[in-house]
Design a protein with these regions (language model features):
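Glycine-rich phosphate/pyrophosphate-binding beta-alpha loops
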Residues: 132, 209, 264, 330-343
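Conserved metal-phosphate-binding beta-hairpin within the catalytic cores
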Residues: 239, 248-250, 303-335, 345
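Phosphate-binding site of ATP-dependent enzymes
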Residues: 216-297, 318-325
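Active-site "cap" helix and flanking loop/linker of ATP-utilizing ligase/carboxylase catalytic domains
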Residues: 260-312, 343-367
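Active-site nucleotide/adenylate-binding loops and adjacent lid/helix of ATP-dependent enzymes
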Residues: 3, 23, 27-31, 35, ...
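ATP-binding N-terminal substructure of ATP-dependent carboxylate-amine bond-forming enzymes
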Residues: 5-8, 12, 18-157, 161-163, ...
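Hydrophobic beta-strand scaffold residues
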Residues: 59, 150-151, 179, 199, ...
Length: 367
C-alpha cells in the first residue's frame, strides 16, 4: 500500500468535513427506476438510507419511478416511517421491468413518479442511488439542474458520456488511457472489420454486465449480438482480455486502493456481482507498487478525460503479460453490502456511513 498517496486521501477526507452542514440535513435517497439494475439500486438505496439515518439526518428512500402518491407528501421528512420495509434482496436474475411499469399505466407521460420532483425540491440534497440507464445517462441530473435540486455524483454531461461505452472508449484512446481494441455496431449494420475470437459483445449503454456476452465462434457471436441488441440499438464488440479483473474508485479526483475481483465460476456477470459468495474480492489487490501506482494513475486520468466530478469507479482488466486496460467508468458506483467502493474505502479506515457522508460533502462543496 502506498502510504503517502493514501495519507493525502485521508487528509482530504478530514478536510471535506469542514464543508459539512452544521444542521442535520433533509436527504432524499433516490433509487429504483425501470432499468435492469432496479433491484441493485434499491438495495444500494436501503444501505445508504440506514447509514444516513444513523448519522441523525432526516432521510427518505424514494423510488424515482413509483414516487409517493399520498396527499401528505409535503410532510414526508417529519414522518416516522421505515422507508426500507418494501425493499427485498437482489435476485440472481434481472428484475421484471414490465411488471414494475404495470404499476403505473401513465408512465410514458412522465418518467418521474408522483411528487418525486416536489419532494426532492424540499431536500437539502438528493443522494443518487440509481444505477443503469435511467440514473446514469444524465437525463435526471439535467432535470434536477433545471429544477434547482442538488444531488450527489457527477453532472449530466459526464454522465451521458460515460453511459455510452463507445464514446468512452474514444475518449480513453484520445486521453492516453489503455482500453481494449474494439468496434461499435448498430442494429442492422455489417461490421467493416471483425474483432478476433474470443471477443466480448456489450450493449452500448448498460451496466452490471447486463447485455454483456462472450463469443468464441460464429454461432456464439450471432447469439451474443442477439442478446446485446435486446438492451440497446448499438453494441460494442471488443477484444477479450484474459486475465485478472480490478476496480479502482476515484473520489474527488484521487484513486482509492485497488480491489481485485475473481469470480468463482464464469466471469463477473450480474449474478456474480450481487450474490454473496459468488466472487473472491481482495483489497488492496496483490500487485507490485509500480503496477499499483500505474493503474491508479490511469484511473485518475480516465476520471479527467471523461470530465467526471466528485466520484466514480473505473473497471480494469490485466492480461497475462501484465498489461492493463480500462473497460469503463461507473458514474454511480454500487453501494450494496457487497459493493466495491465501500470495500476500498474501508481499507483507508473510512467506514460505510462515513463514506456516504463524504460523498455528500464533496458533492455539496461548491454550494
Amino acid at each position: 500500500m502506498q502510504i503517502s498517496h493514501f495519507s493525502e486521501i485521508l487528509k482530504e477526507f478530514a478536510h471535506a468535513g469542514r464543508f459539512r452542514k452544521e444542521f442535520k440535513m433533509k436527504i432524499v435517497v433516490l433509487a429504483g427506476g425501470i432499468s435492469t439494475e432496479r433491484d441493485v439500486s434499491l438495495v444500494s438505496g436501503m444501505g445508504i438510507y440506514k447509514a444516513l439515518k444513523g448519522k441523525g439526518h432526516q432521510v427518505m428512500l424514494l423510488d424515482v419511478f413509483l414516487g409517493y402518491a399520498n396527499e401528505d407528501w409535503k410532510n414526508v421528512f417529519e414522518k416516522d416511517v421505515d422507508w426500507t420495509a418494501s425493499v427485498g434482496a437482489i435476485k440472481d436474475q434481472n428484475p421484471d421491468i414490465d411488471a414494475v411499469k404495470a404499476l403505473r399505466p401513465d408512465w410514458k407521460k412522465n418518467f418521474f413518479g408522483p411528487h418525486v420532483i416536489d419532494i426532492c425540491q424540499q431536500a437539502d440534497v438528493v443522494f443518487m442511488a440509481l444505477h443503469g440507464e435511467n440514473g446514469e445517462n444524465g437525463k435526471i441530473q439535467a432535470c434536477f439542474d433545471l429544477n434547482g435540486i442538488r444531488y450527489t455524483g457527477t453532472d449530466y454531461v459526464s454522465s451521458a458520456i460515460c453511459m455510452n461505452k463507445a464514446i468512452s472508449k474514444d475518449l480513453f484512446a484520445a486521453g492516453g488511457v489503455p482500453t481494449p481494441v474494439g468496434i461499435r455496431l448498430k442494429k442492422g449494420e455489417t461490421p467493416d472489420v471483425q474483432v478476433p475470437y474470443p471477443c466480448v459483445v456489450k450493449a452500448c449503454c448498460g451496466g452490471s454486465s447486463v447485455g454483456v456476452v462472450m463469443a468464441n465462434n460464429d454461432e456464439e457471436y450471432a447469439a451474443a449480438l442477439e442478446e446485446a441488441f435486446k438492451y440497446d440499438d448499438e453494441v460494442v464488440i471488443e477484444q477479450y482480455i484474459k486475465g485478472r479483473e480490478f476496480s479502482v474508485g476515484v473520489v474527488d479526483g484521487k484513486a482509492y486502493p485497488i480491489i481485485e475481483i475473481a469470480p468463482i465460476h464464469g466471469f463477473y456477470d450480474y449474478k456474480n456481482k450481487y450474490q454473496a459468495g459468488s466472487t473472491i474480492e481482495t483489497c488492496p489487490a496483490e500487485l507490485s507498487e509500480e503496477k499499483t501506482l500505474t493503474m491508479q494513475a490511469a484511473a485518475e486520468q480516465a476520471f479527467k478525460v471523461l470530465r467526471l466530478k466528485n466520484y466514480a469507479r473505473m473497471d480494469f482488466m490485466m492480461d497475462e503479460k501484465g498489461d492493463f486496460y480500462c473497460l469503463e467508468a461507473n458514474t454511480l458506483p454500487g453501494m450494496t453490502p457487497t459493493s466495491l467502493l465501500p470495500q476500498e474505502a474501508k481499507v483507508l479506515g473510512i467506514e460505510y456511513a462515513d463514506l456516504c457522508q463524504l460523498l455528500i460533502d464533496i458533492s455539496m462543496r461548491d454550494e
